Amino acid sequence: MMNTYELLTDALRCAMHGERVQWDSIEGEELSSLIELSREHRVLPMLAEAAYCCAAVKTHPRLYEQLISEARSQTVAQAQRTADFLLFYSFLNEKGLRPVITKGVMCRRLYPYPDQRTSVDEDLLIDPGQFRAYHGALIEFGMDLVDPESVSDFETSYVDRVKNLYIEVHKSLFDEDSKAYGDCNAPFAGALERSIETEYEGVKLRTLSHTDHMLYLLLHSYKHLLHGGFGIRQAADICMFGSRSGKEIDWKLIRTECEKLRIERFAAAIFTIGAEQLAIDKPKAFADIAIGTEHLLLDMLSGGLYGVEDINRAHSSTLTIEAVAADRTGRRRKGAIASLFPPRRALEGRFGYLKKHPWLLPAAWAQRTWSYLTKREHGPVSPSESLKIGRERIELLREYGIIE
């Protein structure tokens, strides 16, 4: 009998390869938990596709109909967002603007049924010198700034609330001010010049080169690992991209850059999970790294898409980010209590007023603490549990050689 995590990975594997699950039986409580887990990982439509003809699932008609109905709704909504995004990108083309697309539609197209792999937003990388032109074009298209004070940041978010279209414009792929992963930008010097043209649904799109995109997917997951975690869908994206674009990827360069950033064991673990759980061959460039995956796989499956399903785990990211930042800069790591009072820069994304009024940092600390103690929608809040999770996840980073 498979547990819920095993059922999810089995369903995802089938959906990725255009197959259907072959389950002999499943209890109603198991199916209910599986559906909820698929929501947390944003793969519910793929679960529905894989389980569509499964007699065992159909023995629970209420849950089966709920699954199919919700999957159809999400897939239709994603198809509309994709169409709206392509219309938006065509509008930019007409303006002579060619931003580089990362993730999003470029990952969706890897799957047998692209719009079953849902995306909340679309990410665009631009030349910082052209930001004013892009900003003007987005406003003209009818989009609004999510945060009017964020236009000077490395990323700026826009939303069309009528179309439910969410766009993130990046001046760099990673926050250069981050002590933990700001150095992840280095391999992408010249990425705009190396970008390539592709086509999707008749629209010409510009995206990262195959090698740059492969590396970016790995590093993006690494960033989320530090911030609380990343889910099985991101691992699927990475492995699918590596498999589909493998001949176009400079794997030697990927391995070299991973070693520079000390994430080669982490990358090897993801590819091993792809081979063991998702039936996608491990790239030869990482075949020599024999690595256990049990702890990383559990971390991925237990945290949802971005490790924020548990509020205590979400807050534990302060500890993991601090551990890597200290390791990278060679300074002494701050204690757990100090991590509860992060520097202004670390809180600016959440408390926009700090950008213009840095002296309000103590107020932000108080607001953050109050929110932490009163928030309940993702489960009971416990500072001690957050510290415990943080310490456990620091050991995970140590296991994969990310920190010493």
Task: State where each predicted segment sits.
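Conserved NTP-donor binding/palm subdomain of two-metal-ion nucleotidyltransferases/polymerases, i.e.
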Residues: 1-120, 126-404
